[in-house]
Amino acid sequence: MKAFIAILSIAIVLLLIVSIKETSAKDCKQECVKRYTKGDLTNFLKAEYEPKNRGGICYCEFTCHVKFYIYLKHEMD
């Protein structure tokens, strides 16, 4: 029974980590589009998020060869 609870606890922690990363990736894409095209997704190519402690680096790339980085800061509660 203790092994089951331990495995379940680990699974929940991993699920939380994945959901935080997905949210940050969405934030990354939204920030890229908002800063360069003011919400227009026409020239958007990709956004890659690299998590760090209390924030991360967001790489933005557009089809018109525009590339830049954004530093996202996420407050930890």
UniProtKB/Swiss-Prot annotation:
Molecular functions per Gene Ontology: toxin activity
Disulfide bridge partners, by residue number: none
Cellular location(s): Secreted
Key word RNA-binding present: no
Record keywords, A-Z: Disulfide bond, Neurotoxin, Secreted, Signal, Toxin
PTM info: Contains 2 disulfide bonds.
Record's GO cellular component terms: extracellular region
Signal peptide: 1-25
Entry's transmembrane regions: none
Keyword presence, Cytoplasm: no
Principal localisation: secreted
Propeptide residue intervals: 26-46
Tissue spec: Expressed by the venom gland.
Stated family: Belongs to the scolopendra neurotoxin 3 family.
Protein name: Putative neurotoxin 1
Annotated source species: Scolopendra mutilans (Chinese red-headed centipede)
